[in-house]
Amino acid sequence: MGIHHLFKKGRPVISFEIFPPKQTSTIDTIYDTLDGLYDLKPDFISVTYSAGGKGASDHVTCDIASIIQNKYHITPLAHLTCVNSTKEEILQNLKRLQENQIENILALRGDIRPDVEPKHDFEHASDL
C-alpha cells in the first residue's frame, strides 16, 4: 500500500524508523526489534540506508524492508540515498526493491562521508 493512502484515513499515522545492523552484526539481530514494534501495530516502518553511509551493505535495506512486508505484514518505507552511489548502483537498488515489491521509497541525498570521495552522478535527492 502506498503510504500516502494512510494519511487519507482521517486518523493519526504511527510509524517507526529502524537502522540496519552494522557490518559486525547479522540481519538476524533486527528480528528482536521488529518483534517489539509489531506488537505496537505501526502503520509503516521506515528503514534507513545506514547511518553516515557506513555499516550495512546496499542490499540490507531492501532485505529488511522485505522482511517487514512479508513476515510482519507492515508497510515498509525504504530509504534510498544517492550521494555515495553511482547511477548503476542506484538502478541496481531500485531493481532489487522492485523485485521485492517494495513500493514506498524515500529518496534522500544521504550523508557525505569524509573518508570517501563522493560520487557525482547524483548531487541531490531531487536528481534521483
Describe each model-derived feature in a short phrase.
Residues 1-16:
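N-terminal amphipathic alpha-helix/helix-capping segment at the start of soluble metabolic enzymes
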Residues 9-13, 41-44, 72-76, 101-103:
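Short, well-ordered coil/turn segments that N-cap beta-strands
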Residues 14-20, 45-47, 76-80, 105-107:
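Hydrophobic faces of well-ordered beta-strands that scaffold small-molecule active sites
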Residues 21, 43-62, 111-120:
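Glycine-rich, proline-tolerant flexible connector loops at the mouths of alpha/beta enzymes
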Residues 25-29, 82-96, 127:
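Glycine-rich anion/phosphate-binding loops
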Residues 32-48:
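Catalytic domains of carbohydrate-active enzymes, especially glycoside hydrolases
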Residues 55-79, 123-128:
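Alpha-helix-loop-beta-strand connector modules within alpha/beta enzyme cores
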Residues 104-128:
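Conserved anion-binding
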